[in-house]
């Protein structure tokens, strides 16, 4: 039993053993967690905002968040529903577009939304940048940079995207500080829900698993001392 448990977290902690052992099945929550969270949550919310508002600044910020969600999805699954996504029961089995198609699509969305800005401010509450459009533009540029680098790494129009990277870096118009929902406090019932559940309620389960520790130790990685 000890040899089995050594492959896991610790003898007294077993919440994430399925992750350590890669014992996933088709019914495992982890298999489609990103898909369900992003499409049923974030992307559906963004769709509703875009359908209801005509304010260019609100649409710009929402488009950036929509692009960010799709970018994460592509990084997780390579291909992703995009051109036929978010139609609900009208199309319950949307086509999965290539990551290249999705990236180019959302880059175009960002460009169009930014071009539509007319100097007006945001109407909706903004818990990320406090309605600072310059910061939203900086976030958009950071997303562009990330996707350009992905294209270069995949050798897709590498020369063209290399020039785009050089231009972004030279202009240096990125956000400052952090991109975060700045509305939580370290007080009961006021913490980030994820933090409240995992960092406060399940602290003991947050320990490095045996496969990680054994690898770090065998390679002499100083991170083993931290973990």
Protein language model annotation of sequence segments:
Residues 15-226:
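Structured, solvent-exposed acidic/aromatic patches
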Residues 1-8, 12, 226-227:
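Single conserved hydrophobic/aromatic residue that forms the stacking wall/gate
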